[in-house]
């Protein structure tokens, strides 16, 4: 890497809302190890982002990794899903019941990762915010929904879905 490239990566890590403060420091230290001590000092900088709060959810990195694995291996997953209460506490949806879906894509939009998956029970494509998913487990069952995914225009789906947030 050239130093300007590493500076750009450091800035992106610091600015990213889904990366916790501790994980940001850890990643930046790893980037610093790629250059001399003198150049590493230039990477020790703070990017000021207005109105930005970093996540406290350390498990998101492992969730993303599990989801990529499930997508790559063509496996179904199960997980619990939560929402935030007005008291800013996690409340599991479906009274803590499990969601079982076939993951097809991960989408990064407006500082959040979303899973786009086929829900066989509902027979439709759905999306889930990855930072609200808990206890993700890969199942041995093969992924379903190939025909439904092939028939759906993913570009139109994501534009309609994520366009309403922007």
Annotated model-derived regions:
Residues 37-42, 61-65, 93-96, 132-139:
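A broad, low-specificity signal for short, low-complexity segments enriched in glycine/proline
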Residues 66-67, 103, 159-163:
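Generic recognition of flexible, low-complexity loop/linker segments
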Residues 68-121, 126:
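Loop-centered beta-sheet repeat module
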């Amino acid at each position: 890497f050239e130093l300007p490239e590493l500076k750009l990566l450091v800035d992106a890590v610091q600015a990213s809302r889904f990366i916790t403060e501790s994980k940001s420091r850890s990643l930046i230290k790893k980037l610093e190890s790629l250059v001399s001590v003198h150049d590493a000092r230039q990477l020790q900088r703070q990017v000021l982002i207005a109105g930005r709060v970093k996540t406290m959810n350390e498990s998101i990195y492992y969730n993303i990794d599990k989801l990529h694995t499930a997508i790559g291996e063509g496996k179904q997953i199960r997980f619990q899903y939560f929402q935030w209460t007005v008291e800013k506490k996690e409340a599991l949806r479906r009274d803590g019941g499990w969601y079982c879906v076939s993951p097809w894509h991960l989408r990064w939009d407006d500082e959040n990762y979303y899973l786009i998956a086929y829900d066989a029970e509902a027979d439709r494509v759905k999306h889930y915010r990855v930072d609200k998913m808990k206890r993700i487990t890969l199942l041995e069952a093969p992924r379903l929904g190939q025909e439904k995914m092939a028939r759906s225009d993913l570009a139109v789906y994501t534009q309609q879905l994520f366009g309403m947030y922007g």
